[in-house]
Design a protein with these regions (language model features):
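Nucleotide-activated chemistry modules centered on ATP-dependent adenylation/adenylyltransferase
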Residues: 2-221
Length: 221
């Protein structure tokens, strides 16, 4: 008799329906109870990146390790957010491209223009490959992401729980609005990274850079 994977056992439609009426902490607890040590967090070091680790620690009494992909192009504000998380005792696992920034810029000049023929190629090199490598090395079964549906058009169609490439993504604060996220930041005295800039998201910072296809984000099932 074949062994069933967790993915085969989960009724995603029912889980997502039930999550509509659950608190964010309950969603996090469900994720840990389901995936145990296979659960990780991800962070971009972005504007509200202090929220999910804090909420997770408050929900579970601890936080699973946090995966950060260093694109090689982040500013000091984003690196300071990572330092803050490290100073707060979070276990940060950093992954980066195996190709140096210098090599990339020599081989793919002006790649950061979204209209460049090189744009998607370099995004894959500096973001998708390191993240997938991290997932494989750490044996990630599921990961918590801190995205919210109001942030981009594509995120409006995301589910609380979804699968891609045998990895489950759980978005516990998907339904938070501006007021709720700001209230949480203030009540918990958390830092805000107003100057975060992700070069892979383009000048308007709205691109999802196909990461849902490559690393399991925002794929509806």
């Amino acid at each position: 008799m074949p062994i069933m994977n967790i993915e085969d056992k989960l009724d995603l439609e029912e889980i997502n329906k039930s999550f509509v009426n659950k608190e964010s902490k309950e969603r996090i607890i469900w994720a840990y109870e389901t995936f145990k040590e296979g659960l990780f967090l991800t962070t971009s070091g972005g504007k509200t990146s202090a929220v999910l680790p804090n909420l997770t620690r408050d929900s579970l009494g601890f936080s699973p390790p946090i995966i950060f992909v260093d694109l090689g192009y982040f500013n000091d504000c984003t690196h300071n957010m990572l330092k803050y998380l490290e100073n707060e005792g979070y276990d940060i696992r950093i992954y980066k491209s195996l190709i140096s920034k210098k090599e990339i810029e020599e081989k793919y000049p002006n790649w950061s223009d979204p209209d460049s023929d090189y744009f998607n190629k370099v995004v894959s090199i500096i973001k998708h490959e390191p993240l997938n490598r991290g997932f494989k090395e750490l044996k990630v079964k599921a990961w918590l992401g801190g995205v919210m549906s109001h942030e981009t058009e594509e995120r409006k169609t995301a589910n609380f729980v979804q699968y891609n490439k045998s990895i489950c993504q759980v978005l516990p604060i998907l339904d938070w609005d501006h007021c709720k996220i700001n209230e949480y930041l203030i009540l918990n005295k958390l830092p805000l990274n107003q100057n975060h800039f992700d070069i892979t998201k383009g000048p308007d910072q709205k691109r999802e850079c196909n990461i849902w296809k490559e690393c399991g984000i925002f794929r509806n099932t």
